[in-house]
Amino acid sequence: MDRHLCICREIQLRSGLLFPFLLLMMLADLALPAQRHPPVVLVPGDLGNQLEAKLDKPKVVHYLCSKRTDSYFTLWLNLELLLPVIIDCWIDNIRLVYNRTSRTTQFPDGVDVRVPGFGETFSLEFLDPSKRNVGSYFYTMVESLVGWGYTRGEDVRGAPYDWRRAPNENGPYFLALQEMIEEMYQMYGGPVVLVAHSMGNMYMLYFLQRQPQAWKDKYIQAFVSLGAPWGGVAKTLRVLASGDNNRIPVIGPLKIREQQRSAVSTSWLLPYNHTWSHEKVFVYTPTANYTLRDYHRFFQDIGFEDGWFMRQDTQGLVEALVPPGVELHCLYGTGVPTPNSFYYENFPDRDPKICFGDGDGTVNLESVLQCQAWQSRQEHKVSLQELPGSEHIEMLANATTLAYLKRVLLEEP
């Protein structure tokens, strides 16, 4: 037989034997997870995700208010509910009722509130389901994550919660969060990166301080903290005293004050003595000044003594000196005038004059830099990144923020 034909037949034979093997190798490669980046959990801040409500109320505060609904509707954020007169209905539905005996809050009679979209991102991408720009929150960040290869509801998920309440009343949330993190670890073959904003950082600190170190080492790759109020926020005293409409002209500060006071998380975010001087005056009035040692008298003088009980219930929820025990990245805005103290001529029912300090417009620099203290208190790396001129909400879409996050997730230089 021609030697050339023999060689060809031998090659064909070997190819025939190799082809099934190569095919199996290719299929095996396809079966391997395509995941090359860590899964991400996004945790919003105060007011930072949608809430839904269903009504079956014994009475209403105005004849224009709905007494009963057949299904759940958007309670937050729905701009149509913030119109004059209608806002009275909204406040009566979204407020919490504090029980001094149980030291917990309840929904008003006939109101059921739920948090939509746990594990999804929609309820924190846009606070208003109509996706108006005014309600845009995590949208730009999630879009960036998608551009880096992530998929909504799969390897990037949201962890929304009832932000009116402090962690001590949201026990089921933390169980669900732990289960979701463990599930994502199993599905995507590695630990999770937590990305939290504002009060969401306090929620995550509470969560991490209660996890065994072995659990954190296995399931958490890093914690990216954006605008964290570690030491509380000075503007909280103004919110409690005279209300804060966040510059929304159709909402009167005194009108919104009832809802803001009823949220336990508001009192939880008062300034803490581990960050602020005991001598610092936050509120000046013609008859009295208030430091953080004067909270009891402050609540008495504004006519809201439930707030003092709320503060007592929540002030020990996170331990200032106990670090999270995971790799931590603290990003914070500077150079934006941030309320630091308040001067009232008519206390507490008139807007104050405001003295400003440094920060991101909401969180004071003194508070967010609390994470510096953890650099010497944990083995895991603690990194800080200043965002000059970055406002509290805008930092989520800040180019420096997104570039930093991309480096953490994709381990780019």
UniProtKB/Swiss-Prot annotation:
Residues that hold substrate according to the record: 46, 199
GO molecular function: acylglycerol O-acyltransferase activity; calcium-independent phospholipase A2 activity; O-acyltransferase activity; phospholipase A1 activity; zinc ion binding
Glycosylation sites: 99, 273, 289, 398
Keyword Oxidoreductase: no
pH effects: Optimum pH is 4.5.
Active-site positions on this chain: 198 (acyl-ester intermediate), 360 (charge relay system), 392 (charge relay system)
Cystines in this chain: 65-89
EC assignment: 2.3.1.-, 3.1.1.32, 3.1.1.4, 3.1.1.5
Activity control note: Transacylase activity is inhibited by MJ33.
GO biological process, one term: ceramide metabolic process
Annotated signal sequence range: 1-33
Nuclease keyword on record: no
Tissue and organ distribution: Detected in alveolar macrophages (at protein level). Widely expressed. Expressed at highest levels in alveolar macrophages.
Job description of the protein: Has dual calcium-independent phospholipase and O-acyltransferase activities with a potential role in glycerophospholipid homeostasis and remodeling of acyl groups of lipophilic alcohols present in acidic cellular compartments. Catalyzes hydrolysis of the ester bond of the fatty acyl group attached at sn-1 or sn-2 position of phospholipids (phospholipase A1 or A2 activity) and transfer it to the hydroxyl group at the first carbon of lipophilic alcohols (O-acyltransferase activity).
Name of the protein: Lysosomal phospholipase A and acyltransferase
Organism in which the protein naturally occurs: Rattus norvegicus
Phylogenetic placement of the source organism: Eukaryota, Metazoa, Chordata, Craniata, Vertebrata
GN (gene name): Pla2g15
